Each structure stands twice: as structure tokens, then as C-alpha cells.
């Protein structure tokens, strides 16, 4: 039977590995390297991504190819997602899905988000750099021109954010009418 893209003990073709494939089980029959239509015997896609470094990924033997090599959102400091999402099984769509990574596509469109994926929407006012982006994609966030670090941006920006003179500390005041 096919090895169903097992990450250990398989050759490049992964065909006819038998017991050397280790852990695929009969539920994976005939999947091939694409891992489409795998059964639960393939090991699933748990959130065991190990460390939370830049190369922290969900397991290779993912039965959903779209989730196989995107950053593992289960680690808060992993990749660009920054959420607390589960493994590949709960991923929907590309880059972890819109719902749990910061707003829906509709919400992004209403505040001028130009990114195709809503995993990390960017809703800056004109003139604001990438560090002035708001994660929740509700309203634009604007820092003073003297702001040079992301900590000078306000996370819940209903009005433009005014940083104090010392922009190296996360102290902001919100301008209210």
C-alpha cells in the first residue's frame, strides 16, 4: 500500500514501504505524496510543532495539503500568524484561516486591507509604515512621524495615536474628541 507521505523511513517514491514507513496504518491507503484523502491512520495534524522558532511547522503527514507547511499558529511566537490556533485539522484555508487570525475578509475590505489572506491584515492609514498596522483590522492606526518602533503604535486605534517624546517605550495616548 502507499505510504501516504510519512516523514520517516520512506524513499522518494514512498511506494511499497511497508513496515518501514512506520505509523501510516491502513487508513492511509493510496494517498501518495499529496496526502489528499488520508485517513486518521496518517497520524493527523496535532499541534506538536516543537519549538516556536521561525521554522516551526505542523507535521508533514498532514492529511490537508493546504496546512502542511504553513506556520503553526498553535505557537504564539511562530511565524506570522501569532494566534493560538490548533493544528492542521482546524486550519481552514491558507495561512491558518481568517477567523482566528484577525478578522474576516469582509472586515478587512471595509477598512482598506489589501492582503489576500486575512491571517495578518494590514490596515494602516496613508503614510503609516508596516509597524503601524493593527492586528484586529477595525480602524486605521497612525503614529507620529517620529515613531520608529512598533511599540509606539496603539493596538485599539479609534483615533490617531500620539506617542510621547520618548518613542522607545510603549507609551501612547489616544486622541479623543
Swiss-Prot record:
- The regions listed as transmembrane in this protein's record are none
Q: Pinpoint the residue ranges of every sequence repeat in the record.
A: 62-65, 118-121, 137-140, 147-150, 157-160, 167-170
Question: What cellular component GO annotations does this protein have?
Answer: cytosol; intermediate filament
Keyword Repeat among record annotations: yes
Region annotation (6 X 4 AA repeats of C-C-X-P) ranges: 62-170
Quaternary form?
A: Interacts with hair keratins.
Known role: In the hair cortex, hair keratin intermediate filaments are embedded in an interfilamentous matrix, consisting of hair keratin-associated protein (KRTAP), which are essential for the formation of a rigid and resistant hair shaft through their extensive disulfide bond cross-linking with abundant cysteine residues of hair keratins. The matrix proteins include the high-sulfur and high-glycine-tyrosine keratins.
Quote the protein name from its UniProt record. Answer: Keratin-associated protein 5-2
**What organism is the protein native to?**
Homo sapiens (Human)
Amino acid at each position: 500500500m502507499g505510504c501516504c507521505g510519512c516523514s520517516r523511513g520512506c524513499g522518494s517514491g514512498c511506494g511499497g514501504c511497508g513496515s518501514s514507513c512506520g505509523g501510516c496504518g491502513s487508513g492511509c491507503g493510496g494517498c501518495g505524496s499529496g496526502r489528499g484523502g488520508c485517513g486518521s491512520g496518517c497520524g493527523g495534524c496535532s499541534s506538536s510543532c516543537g519549538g516556536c522558532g521561525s521554522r516551526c511547522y505542523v507535521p508533514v503527514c498532514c492529511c490537508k495539503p493546504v496546512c502542511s507547511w504553513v506556520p503553526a499558529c498553535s505557537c504564539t511566537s511562530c511565524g506570522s500568524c501569532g494566534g493560538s490556533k490548533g493544528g492542521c485539522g482546524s486550519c481552514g484555508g491558507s495561512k491558518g484561516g481568517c477567523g482566528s487570525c484577525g478578522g474576516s475578509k469582509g472586515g478587512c475590505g471595509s477598512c482598506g486591507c489589501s492582503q489576500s489572506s486575512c491571517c495578518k491584515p494590514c490596515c494602516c492609514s496613508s503614510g503609516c509604515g508596516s509597524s503601524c498596522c493593527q492586528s484586529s483590522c477595525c480602524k486605521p492606526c497612525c503614529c507620529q512621524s517620529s515613531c520608529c518602533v512598533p511599540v509606539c503604535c496603539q493596538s485599539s486605534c479609534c483615533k490617531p495615536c500620539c506617542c510621547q517624546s520618548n518613542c522607545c517605550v510603549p507609551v501612547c495616548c489616544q486622541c479623543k474628541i
